[in-house]
Curated annotation (Swiss-Prot):
Zn(2+) binds at residues 106, 108, 120, 124. NCBIfam families: PRK05710.1-3, queuosine_YadB. This is Glutamyl-Q tRNA(Asp) synthetase. Binds 1 zinc ion per subunit. A motif ('KMSKS' region) lies at residues 233-237. Transmembrane segments: none annotated. Catalyzes the tRNA-independent activation of glutamate in presence of ATP and the subsequent transfer of glutamate onto a tRNA(Asp). Glutamate is transferred on the 2-amino-5-(4,5-dihydroxy-2-cyclopenten-1-yl) moiety of the queuosine in the wobble position of the QUC anticodon. Its EC number is 6.1.1.-. ATP binds at residue 236. One of its GO terms (biological process) is glutamyl-tRNA aminoacylation. Keywords: Aminoacyl-tRNA synthetase, ATP-binding, Ligase, Metal-binding, Nucleotide-binding, Zinc.
Length: 300
């Protein structure tokens, strides 16, 4: 896998929020990490809206996300990509995988599977169900998939034993995250993925799908999640407060500390653009803690 250079203009990163709510501090840490990692090597930073699940989308969230990123100085390159406009591309790949026998229809209910701890037992693997009204699962091999994360180090997962065949299209017709993210990263030419450590165990599934479709493997950097005292990550479902424009500078500095970066107290009087300019020049991804969570209470 190629290494990063100080001026790697071939670098293409991305931030891919879900418009199910407003951006919060945890979102900021992820966006800032991916932005800095791209800008520090003069790379491109793309923005993709992962809006494949309309029932979960919050009215006004799309525009609010764009406005918040702009007010915090996190400007992106090119046009925003909306996954809701990419359904034809997803459908073509699902059809291809199904017709090749690499995917199959699954009629299992959540209740049937709830005692299997998220590992699909293969009930429908050889059942030959019709596609109508069924989910589509991708067959996985009995293999271990490994990769080296730039922060978390070596990671491996036995797909067959630890995951099982996974859904690429839901029974309601909506496309699964695992499919959409792989297709869109390849289509956009993404070379580097910087995201939260909650997606670390998703990566082997994505590596397998990349391999199956002949895509290049990006570099991965999974940052620690910011968690509340009860251990839950900051998120929309826990009513984490949305980012406010008037707090941009102190929150950017706090996010930098969450990423292990040094901050100068004098920057509290700086503009967001000035904070980002300094952070970009001093970006050290190797300073990010090799852990999967950071308690919010530990951040001053």
């Amino acid at each position: 896998m190629p290494s990063l250079t100080m001026t790697d203009s071939s670098y293409i990163g991305r931030f891919a929020p879900t418009p199910s709510g407003f951006l919060h501090f945890g979102s900021l840490v992820a966006a800032l990490a991916s932005w800095l990692d791209a800008r520090a090597v003069n790379g491109r930073w793309l923005l993709r809206m992962e809006d494949t699940d309309p029932p979960r989308e919050m009215p006004g969230a799309r525009d609010a996300i764009l406005q918040t990123l702009e007010r915090y100085g996190l400007h992106w390159d090119g046009e925003v990509v909306f996954q809701s406009q990419r359904h034809d591309a997803y459908a073509a790949v699902v059809d291809r995988l199904f017709n090749m026998g690499l995917a199959y229809a699954c009629t299992c209910s959540r209740k049937q599977l709830e005692s299997y701890n998220g590992i699909y037992p293969g009930f429908c693997r050889n059942a030959g169900h019709a596609r109508e009204g069924a989910a589509i699962r991708l067959r996985v091999p009995e293999l271990i998939y490994r990769f080296t994360d730039r922060v978390q180090g070596e990671y491996q997962q036995h797909l067959g034993r630890e995951v099982g065949d996974f859904v690429i299209q839901r029974r309601d017709g909506l496309y699964a995250y695992q499919l959409a993210v792989v297709l869109d990263d390849a289509w956009q030419g993404v070379t580097d993925i910087v995201r939260g450590a909650d997606l670390l165990d998703n990566t082997p599934r994505q590596l397998y799908l990349q391999e199956l479709l002949g895509f290049s493997q990006p570099r991965y950097l999974h940052i620690p999640l910011i968690v509340q005292p009860d251990g839950h990550k900051l998120g929309k479902s826990y009513r984490s407060p949305p980012l406010q424009a008037e707090h941009a500078t102190p929150l950017l500095l706090r996010a930098l500390r969450a990423l292990g970066q040094e901050t100068d107290p004098e920057l509290l009087l700086a503009t967001p653009a000035e904070v980002l300019a300094v952070a970009r020049a001093q970006w050290r991804p190797e300073a990010i803690a090799q852990r999967t969570t950071v308690p919010e209470a530990d951040l001053r």
